[in-house]
Structures are given as structure tokens and as C-alpha cells.
Amino acid sequence: MSELDSQVPTAFDPFADANAEDSGAGTKEYVHIRVQQRNGRKSLTTVQGLKKEYSYTKILKDLKKEFCCNGTVVQDSELGQVIQLQGDQRKNVSTFLVQAGLVKKDNIKIHGF
């Protein structure tokens, strides 16, 4: 009975894995692409983990032009700069980043639904 008592369900945090890999010698630099549900059928795609030497505004400009959506770059205290795009653009963003040569396909993690 004591084994069953110790299994307490906890809340799921979608950003927990991003915070867990702050630094280390053997850690990979992953790019996390997430989708967040807004109101109704509206959704928001976030891209985080790109290298700091890249120009986020130029990447955002190309993404907006390619996918015909609106977006912005948000400065977060914990996560750094995060690109936000309107709509569910997870697959589009991942293929764009790989084709542009910014990220290898193995270093992309797609989260959501």
C-alpha cells in the first residue's frame, strides 16, 4: 500500500524540459517549436533556442513572408528571445529552419497537441 501512496499525479509543465538543459558539456542545443492554444480555433506557435548570433528579426521577416502570417520577437527573462507566429506553423517552421541551414533536423523538438 505504501507504493500506491507515493505515486501522486503532478501537473505537466511544457516548458520544463527547456529549463532543465541550461548548461553542460554534453548537452545539445535544441530548438523547441511549440503551439499554444488561444481562444477558439486560434493558436500561437513559439520558436525558442536559436543561436544568439542569428538576427531574430531577419528570421522573423522571412517566416512571416513565407507563411503569410503575423509574428513578433518577445524578450523573456528566463528563455531569452522567443519568436511568436500566429497559427499552427510547427511543421512549416521546422522545414524552413532545416532548408535554410540554421538548424539540423536532429536538433529540433516539436511540442504540442
From Swiss-Prot:
Residues bearing PTM N-acetylserine: S2
Annotated region (Disordered) at 1-24
Q: Which InterPro entries match?
A: SUI1 (IPR001950), SUI1_dom_sf (IPR036877), SUI1_euk (IPR005874)
Q: Which UniProt keywords apply?
A: Acetylation, Protein biosynthesis, Translation regulation
Q: Which GO terms describe its biological process?
A: regulation of translation
Highest taxon of the lineage: Eukaryota
Q: Is Glycoprotein tagged as a keyword? A: no
Name the SUPFAM superfamilies on file. eIF1-like
What GO MF terms are annotated? mRNA binding; translation initiation factor activity
Extract the signal peptide range. Answer: none
Q: PROSITE patterns given for it?
A: SUI1
Q: Name one GO cellular component term.
A: cytosol
**Main function:** Probably involved in translation.
The Swiss-Prot or TrEMBL record describes its family as follows: Belongs to the SUI1 family.
Query: What PANTHER family is this protein classified in?
Result: EUKARYOTIC TRANSLATION INITIATION FACTOR SUI1
Protein name (Swiss-Prot/TrEMBL): Protein translation factor SUI1 homolog 1
